[in-house]
Amino acid sequence: MDAVRFDVAAHPGAQAYKLLAGLVVPRPIALVTTIDAQGVINAAPFSFFNVMGTEPPLAVLAPGDREDGTPKDTAANLLANGECVIHLCDEPMADWMVACARSLPPGVSEVDRERLATHPAERVRPPILVDCPVALECR
């Protein structure tokens, strides 16, 4: 069987995203909470994420930029303070994950807007989403 070859340089941006998103299926989707300097909680879904190792434990996610090239809130908050909580979600959380994917202005909290229940994390500032079955506190 011949391998399918894909030249990423010839298919940038949205074309590459569509192909890459379809290569690894099914793939987990994380809902990531971060917090900005003013204490506003951001929540955003990520399909480009996974755990990559155990020594040390390593989780990786790939936030994209806004259309104007500026970092989205998750990336900006991670660059500013280096902390997040990566939540693994189950099917009952699907509607909330879609709602959190909407583009909101910086400083507007998806957690507040969607009335997501939280409780404090033990090791990082961003909170844990109560309804998610798994929460990884990350630095």
Name every feature range the model reports, one short phrase each.
Residues M1-N42, N50-R139:
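Active-site-proximal mixed secondary-structure blocks
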